[in-house]
Amino acid sequence: MRRFLLLPVAGLLAAVVLLLATEYVVARPSRRAKDVPYVANSAPDFDKERHILDVYSPKKAAPRTAGYPVVLFIHGGSWTSGNKNIYTFIGRRLAKQGVVAVVINYRLAPPVHVPEQAADCARALAWTVQHIKEYGGDPARVFVMGHSAGGGLAALLATDDALLAQHGLPQNPVRGAIMDDPAGLDMYSYLKEMKYEGDQQYLVPFGNDPALWKAQSPIYKIRPGLPPFIFFIGGETYPSISGSSGRFRDRLKATGQAPPYTIIPGRHHIPMVLQLYWQHNIIYQQLLKLVGA
């Protein structure tokens, strides 16, 4: 399949059932704060199922007074599916390696669209900056990470200062972005072409307005001075993902950034996130260097 099909949740659930079954067998030197609201329940758009996050913290006190580095992880699912509870293994693995992990839910399409999803992610980031010290994290060392559609949303957090300013962050706090087979980096070009059968499904989250497609495509927000990016691309992923990621990297290079760009041979799209169950892989190795863990 060549088209851009982004991690339907049913397929992922089948793939991770063994991982979840063994989660409690694996040593987990971490603490988990579950279902923490990141939007006030008095807010008119508060969603008790989607405006929540989990925080995974190392059990040991941070070696630095400021606290552990922080990674905010955003799940994928074609912008229409997905749940933080599938990704407990990522939170556990990061905490085991000296990182405070924040794994979030956000509202899905329909009924909302990508701008509302990006706003939810920005609100989760604002909550993280304000509260992460309570969980042993350093608010001055916050990084974002996402897989599939979550990668595109994470890239928006790293590039769209105006979005963050709307949600209480006048200065962008993101210190780096980890892209795990990201989708949605250039939906403007993708939706203009409509090359593959079924591409109209992406009009559900992105709507019919090309101006909105461009506004929600982080590739058009690249400029000098952005935080560092690192990329991990499956050698057998969808051409749209490898293509847009390569163009994103090239635009970053034109600004003077030299983003590490790792192609993992033989990896399809879903295994690019499933491999994070195992602690010893190249994604964690490079991530830990980036965040200074």
Predicted regions and their residues:
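N-terminal cap/lid segment of alpha/beta-hydrolase-fold proteins
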Residues: 23-64
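Catalytic nucleophile-loop/oxyanion-hole region of alpha/beta-hydrolase
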Residues: 38-44, 81-85, 90, 102-139, ...
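Mobile cap/lid helix-loop segments that gate and shape the active-site cleft of serine hydrolases
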Residues: 41, 188-221
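Short beta-strand element of the alpha/beta-hydrolase
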Residues: 65-76
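Primarily recognizes the serine-hydrolase "nucleophile elbow" in alpha/beta-hydrolase
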Residues: 126-192
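Short beta-strand/loop motif that positions the catalytic acidic residue
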Residues: 225, 230-233
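C-terminal catalytic histidine-bearing segment of alpha/beta-hydrolase fold enzymes
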Residues: 232, 246-249, 253-293
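Conserved alpha/beta-hydrolase "acid-adjacent" motif
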Residues: 238-246
